[in-house]
Amino acid sequence: MLQFAIPCLLGLESLVGDEVKKLGLADVRVENGRVLCRGEERDLARLNINLRCGARVLLVLASFRATDFETLFQGTRAVRWEDWIPREGEFPVTGYSINSTLHSVPACQSIVKKAVVERLGAAYGLQTLPETGKRYQIRFSIMKDEVMLCLDASGEGLYKRGYRAVGVAAPLKETLAAALVKLSHYNGRDPFCDPFCGSGTIAIEAALIARNRAPGLNRSFAAQHWAMVDKKIWLDAADEAMDNEFHDKTYEIWGGDIDPHAVEIARHNAELAEVDDTVRFEVDDATRFHWGGQYGRVVTNPPYGERLLEQKEAEELYRAFGRAVDKLPETWRVYVLSSHTEFERCFGRIADKKRKLYNGMLKCDLFMYGKRL
C-alpha cells in the first residue's frame, strides 16, 4: 500500500480526517496540520478529485529521524526515487522545519536535493541530470526531528477548483469555504444564505456539497503527468465521482452582496463550477437581510477590520447585521467567520459556540449561533 499525507489549515484536521475515512482509506491518523492515511495507487486520483478541505495530496516515500545533516543525506539517498522520477524528470525541493535540530530550511533543501541527485544519477548512469521533463515536486517536513519525504501529487493547491476565473478583493479560499459549510452541518434541505457573498465562494461550495459534486472534476493534477502512474486511475476516479453526484434534487442556496460587480463575478464563477442552476446570487444589503421560513442557516465571511474596511466601519457593519439577524426565527442557525476580537460585542450576541480557524495566516473565530447546534 501507499502512504499519503494531506496537509490542511489548523482547525480543519478532523474534517479532512472524516473525508478520508469516507473515501475508505486505511490507517487514518489525524495530526496537527495534516492527516495521514494508506491506500492504493487509485487513491492518488480519488483523494485529489474528492477532497474538499485538504490543502494538497502528498505521496509519502520515507519517514525517519534525523538530528544531523549526514543522517538526513543518507536517509534521503536510501529512498528509491527512481521508482517515481524518470531520468528527465524535474524535481525541485521545498519544505519546512518545526521544533527540530535541523532548523535551517535552505540547508535542508540543499542536502535533500544533493542526495536525490546522487541517487538518481547512480540509478540512471548519469553524471548530470537534465531535469527537462515533467515536474516531480519533492516536499519535506521536519517536525520534532522526524523527517517525512514526499512527492506532491496535486501540483497547485486543492483550493484551486478551476471555477475562480476572476475574484474580488480578499477572497476566501475554497477549502476554507467548504469547511465552513461542513461545520454548519448543511444537509441540502434548509435554505442556505451568505449575505456577504463576494465572489460567491461559500455559496458555490455549499452547492457542490449539496449535490455531492466532487470539487476536483474541473482541473488537472501533477500526478496525472507522472510516468509511473497508470493514467486509467484518473478516468476511473472521475467516473466514480460523477456517478455519486445528485441530479434530481432542488436546493435553496442564495448569496447576496451590495457590490453589483461582485455579484456578476459570483454568477460567472457558478457557471464555471456548473452549479449556476443550483445557487442564486443577487445584489442585496446584508444589513437588511431577511428570509421567510422557519428553518435555515446563514454562513458568511463579512469584511474584517484588517482588510476591506476600517475597523470602526467593520464594527458598525457588524452591529447593523446583528440587528438584521435578530429578526430571524430562533430556529435558524448563523455562522460568522471573523478575526475581530470584539465581534460578539459588536454583533450584539454571545456565540453559542466558537471554533478557532485560520484564514490564510489570519487567526479567526467561527462564531456559531442557534439552539440546534
Where would I find each of the regions flagged by the language model?
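C-terminal catalytic and target-recognition region of SAM-dependent MTase-like enzymes
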Residues: 285-288, 292-373
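SAM-dependent Rossmann-like transferase core, predominantly class I methyltransferases
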Residues: 149-185
